[in-house]
């Protein structure tokens, strides 16, 4: 339904939404005139609020004389009325500093990103690992532990590090293992699981075993990426008034633990879009209707995409949450780019 609001109605809606997001209370016409410095009478504002209510932008709680925004009103505000915001320079510097202080590995970055999103927005911070259309090998090492037992350490194009043990058909010294990895790395660099499995066919036993384990590790990583989610900041959300109802807090826990975001929602999103704000019924699943989700994609090389965002009640500071999500996505993308250093696979 396309509705043309007057400029005054737009301003009234904007002030009602922002006051409600700030206080959590219904907003009356008299208070709105005073706080928003509107140059009209409370009666005129009441009339416009009645029109906005009839158009489903505002609702009239039974326990209050004021109005609150509906889901439709919140969505209109975010799309048409909300002013773009940015994190302050001080916040941006502090966040970048935090990322330089942690271990320079993907899991540490993603856990920190979820934590920073939670602290900055006051909601649950969510981050998924980068998911490759096809995961590729970047580098691997073989480390001798005892006689025939070797530690295989590999790094993928998306920056994931994986370790596994393998038992060789015959013992090799560390010098021999290093020579083997130095010989194979240039041949295998940027190959996917299927290509490495083909290389294993007809290879001598030790090489075939190493190649098969590399292929298995890539398969494991691809599967793990589809089910992993970093979530931080639940304590921020459950302190909010909306979660005074125990069932809503329980529902949020079920959403996070049950994998609904990963298995149903994320595959339906377009990573080329910048920042998505999904409110209530936008999330389609009944379990997610009480919430809002703000998220965007970050990049790790040409073929890998991860998601990060915030999840919370529909009454949230949308402008600040969008600013936090946008900035964290740029920071994580920069870090992934530095780590990956891989070729542009799109270009061949």
From Swiss-Prot:
So what does this one do? Negative regulator of class I heat shock genes (grpE-dnaK-dnaJ and groELS operons). Prevents heat-shock induction of these operons.
Q: Name one GO molecular function term.
A: DNA binding
Which family does the UniProt entry place this protein in? Belongs to the HrcA family.
Q: Which GO terms describe its biological process?
A: negative regulation of DNA-templated transcription
The record's section on InterPro entries has: GAF-like_dom_sf, HrcA, HrcA_C, WH-like_DNA-bd_sf, WH_DNA-bd_sf, WHTH_HrcA_DNA-bd, WHTH_transcript_rep_HrcA_IDD
Keywords for the protein's UniProt record, in alphabetical order: Repressor, Stress response, Transcription, Transcription regulation
Classify the source by domain of life. Answer: Bacteria
* Protein name, UniProt field: Heat-inducible transcription repressor HrcA
Gene that specifies this protein: hrcA
Xref: Pfam families: HrcA, HrcA_DNA-bdg
